[in-house]
């Protein structure tokens, strides 16, 4: 019975691959036009626990005060000093949510609902431009954010997913995930509301409406945002901008990620 169940599961996912590969050709994604740009956006970057997790500061430097570092009210004084130093050095702004992460035993939890909470609070309380880029602290895009937002504006869309690209080098477990991401990105041509936490964009007012209704459940956060946006009738598109992410490179880290994704 177990063998049959496994075979059914494997055949199901192979079917999904075939379906996405065939039907995605019938759908158009939005291509970037270097002549169409927009500066009317803010970048929300959640950062908490340790400033060392902010790995894309150099990448974000050109965007200056459009970058908002979103953190909690439960960090250490050393953390706040270091974050302030970074903000001054790069010209970023800081938004401090009233949220204080709970403690588990002697350790403070730095996952769970923290990321979505500080982003939601920034959307509701911080002064922001007309469009929003939600960006993880270790994520970079291969194309300028001005072009990506320009594509959203030109297509009169409310929010958008982008193409996520894992690292090229790595063992078999990484190469397997590269194929997985290729298939997943094809599916986003059909279902552009399948957002990724690494980077997604939208109108500020629209993202406020979405996050105000969000459950803040961490493992389903990005997909939930897209589902809410779609249910509210907002227009989603998939933009062919390439965003770098690091996929787990060991079987253990991959397994932990999949267990987390399963909820």
Task: Place the predicted regions along the sequence by residue.
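N-terminal membrane-anchoring/stem segments of glycan-assembly enzymes
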Residues: 1-37, 189
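Short, well-formed alpha-helical segments that are part of the catalytic scaffolds
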Residues: 50-63, 76-79
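Active-site-proximal specificity loops/subdomain of glycosyltransferases
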Residues: 79-83, 87-125
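Long helical/loop segments within the catalytic core of UDP-sugar-dependent glycosyltransferases
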Residues: 105-114, 118, 143, 149-218, ...
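Short beta-strand-to-loop acidic/aromatic patch adjacent to the donor-nucleotide binding site
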Residues: 129-140
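Acidic donor-binding loop at a coil-to-helix junction in glycosyltransferase catalytic cores
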Residues: 218-225
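Catalytic donor-sugar/metal-binding loop of nucleotide-sugar-dependent glycosyltransferases
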Residues: 226-244
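Active-site donor/metal-binding and catalytic loop motifs
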Residues: 239-255
């Amino acid at each position: 019975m177990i063998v049959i169940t496994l075979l059914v599961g494997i055949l199901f996912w192979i079917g999904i691959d075939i379906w996405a590969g065939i039907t995605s050709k019938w759908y158009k994604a939005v291509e970037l036009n270097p002549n169409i740009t927009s500066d009317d956006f803010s970048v929300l970057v959640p950062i908490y626990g340790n400033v060392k997790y902010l790995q894309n500061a150099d990448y974000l430097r050109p965007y200056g005060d459009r970058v908002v570092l979103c953190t909690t009210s439960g960090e250490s004084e050393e953390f706040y000093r270091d974050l302030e130093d970074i903000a001054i050095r790069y010209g970023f702004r800081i938004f401090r949510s009233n949220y204080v992460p709970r403690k588990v035993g002697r350790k403070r939890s730095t996952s769970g609902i923290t990321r979505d909470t500080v982003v939601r609070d920034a959307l509701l309380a911080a002064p922001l431009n007309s469009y929003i880029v939600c960006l993880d602290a270790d994520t970079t895009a291969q194309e300028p954010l001005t072009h990506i937002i320009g594509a959203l504006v030109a297509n009169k869309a409310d929010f958008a997913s982008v193409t996520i690209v894992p690292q090229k080098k790595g063992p078999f477990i990484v190469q397997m995930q590269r194929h997985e991401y290729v298939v997943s990105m094809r599916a986003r041509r059909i279902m552009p509301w399948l957002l990724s936490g690494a980077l997604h964009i939208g109108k500020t007012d629209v993202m406020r409406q979405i996050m105000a209704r969000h459950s803040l459940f961490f493992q389903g956060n990005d997909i939930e945002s897209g589902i809410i946006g779609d249910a509210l009738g907002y227009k989603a598109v998939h933009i062919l901008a390439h965003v770098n992410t690091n996929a787990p490179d060991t079987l253990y880290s991959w397994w932990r990620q999949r267990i987390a994704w399963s909820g």
